[in-house]
Every structure is written in structure tokens, then in C-alpha cells.
Amino acid sequence: NGTQKIFYSDRRVLYFSTHQYPYYPGTGGLHEIGEGQALGYTVNVPLRRGAVNGTFISAFRKILEPIALAYKPELILVSAGFDTYYQDPLGGMRVTPEGFAAMARVLLNIADQCCSGRVVSVLEGGYNVVGLARSAKATLEEMFDETHYTDKKLNAMEQEADEKNKPVLRSVISGISPYWNVF
């Protein structure tokens, strides 16, 4: 929410967020897509409670990836919050450490194509200490190529997207497509 606010009218930054919605502080809705010349440079994916690995992978591959490849970032900065971990007391989502690693792989693939692999990840949140540690470890292992999620494995994970969030993903694409000729 603070990051979105800082760059809301700045088209030099593409802001992408997946999060439970509605949730505190109430920002991150579908209609929040930037302002002025930066319309379309804020992309919110406001997911319903209980979203699983496949839903997040689908959002990253079907929404973020085509936009990011068109945008061609010089660097990818990740605000790595792990409160979507499936046992987090506040998050309300169902992402596993493998899901976080798979999301990292999608970002790494984008970075390899756009910005010579430059990715910086900053730890933000997560309220289940064990889950945060496992998820951060899985993400780092993927970033250091100790594991490697292939397209085949990402495709399989994506097939497990939960039904209640598929309309959300379609709505995000519909709302953002006037600003990006990639859908």
C-alpha cells in the first residue's frame, strides 16, 4: 500500500501486487490502476481468501509476465511478504513454500529476458515464523538455482488454481488490457 502510493502516478515503475482483498488498509482494489500518465502501471490482483499456489502462479504468468515483458524493467524489486503462507495466522491464503519458489521462478524468467537477471528481494512480512523461514528458504533456493521450476512444473501448478479466483484474474485482465497490448 505504501509502495503503491509512492509510484501511483509514476510510469517509470510498474507496480504489481497479489493480495487478499478486502483487507487492511483497504487499498489494492481492481479500480486502482494508477493515475495520469501512469494509468495501467499499477496492477492489483485482489484475490479472495483461500487462494492457492496455482492461483498465484496463474496471476504471475497470465497477468504479470506479459505486461512485464512489454514493459522491460531494468530491475525487478520484490517486496517479499510471506503472510500468504497457508498456516499464517493473518494471511488467509494457502500458499506453500513450493508456491513461493514457483513465483520466484516466474520472476527470474522475466528478469532473464528483460534485465540480465537483476532481481532484488526484500523481506517484508509473515507471521508464522516457521512458515516464513521455510518459504524464504524455498525462494532463495530457487533464486540460487538449487531447485529449478520448469515450465512443465509451473503449468501443472497453474492447473490447480482455485475456481473462486478465476473470475478475479479475468477481471484484472479486462481492466488493465486497455493500457497494455498484450492480452
State where each predicted segment sits:
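A general "terminal functional-core" signal
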Residues: N1-F183
